[in-house]
Amino acid sequence: MTIRTQPRKVNAAVVNSHQQMSFHDLQLKAPHQNEVGVRIVACGICHTDLGFLSEGSILGHEGAGIVEQVGSAVTAVKPGDHVLLSYQSCGQCAPCHESQPFNCEHFAKLNFGFQRLDGSSAYPEGVQGHFFGQSAFANYCLVTEQNLVKIAPEFPLEVLAPLGCGMQTGAGTVLNTLKVKAGESLMVMGTGAVGLAAVMAAKIAGAKTIIAVDRDPARLALAIRLGATESINSDEENYLATLCPHLDYVIDTTGIGHLDELAQEVLKEGGTLVRLTGSCGETLTRGRKAISVVQGDSVAQDFLPRLVDYWQQGRFPVEQLITYYHFDDINRALKDAQNGKVIKPVLVWD
């Protein structure tokens, strides 16, 4: 059977010269044989989006929607299927073949390079798309089987959209990278979406001590509701004196430079500091180690269904982190995210 794919008119939020979003109608080329055209229903805003506000770019990488078109080589989904979108990988290199797409040899090109693997683009000249293999700040985008996950149609796309990046990173760090065991202890520095996902995952794992550190009392209170056993306000004088030493793990979501010193104070010998910001610090001592993690060492097709299951069970209540905005309000949503007014903004179409 011949599968015919077609170009499609797309309404997309494009970064303008003032680092604001302006909506434009664009003509997107037909999907390649390995691509899937998805009508976007909702998309989370991640802080990574805020770092790529270059003129002419279409951002957005926590998309969720409904399949409209499939290329001739696509077997995982069909038109009408509901999908969550995640990071892109090539599916061809050694790490991908070893079920480590988060270590894909082409990760930077495919997620931050605004291009397909072959260097081409489906977008008009002057417009940069394919961000994280998505560019989901639009009502339609092209993805591949590598960065979509099919879910049941009864699940709310607007609730589950944020799972594909930040939530996956925080929860995956706990469950995949560290493999936290019942009775272990950890501290989470920063209670944004990534940090709170780590808190929820630590509770799922059965951690005995879960310490949330932040300067926002409301977020610390939410962390307690989501499973933290203790909260510490880093704005309070002598807060270091209240910290419990001999922790198994510290997860830094903030990139604040003095964290390595703090980790030395609270980590047990042989403990692990996880940096989720890509920042570097001094070498740790006495058997302690510092590692960085990409996407929570998660294979989205395996891990996102786990998170959906936890959400169904009420153990991963992501909806408590979300503030909704219509796509028309994208600039307000981005500003609120940048100012820390909201934890996880999610854009929705009508």
Spans of features found by a protein language model:
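NAD(P)H dinucleotide-binding glycine-rich loop of Rossmann-like/cofactor-binding domains
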Residues: A94-M189
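C-terminal hydrophobic helical "lid"/dimerization subdomain
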Residues: M1-A12, Q301-D350
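N-terminal Rossmann-like NAD(P) cofactor-binding module of classical short-chain dehydrogenase/reductase
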Residues: L84, V250-I251, V274
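Glycine-rich beta-strand-centered segment in the early N-terminal region that forms part
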Residues: K29-C43, L53-H97, F102, A152-F155
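Glycine-rich phosphate-binding loop and adjacent beta-alpha segment
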Residues: G257-F316, W349-D350
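Adenosine-nucleotide cofactor-binding segment
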Residues: S185-L196, M200-L262
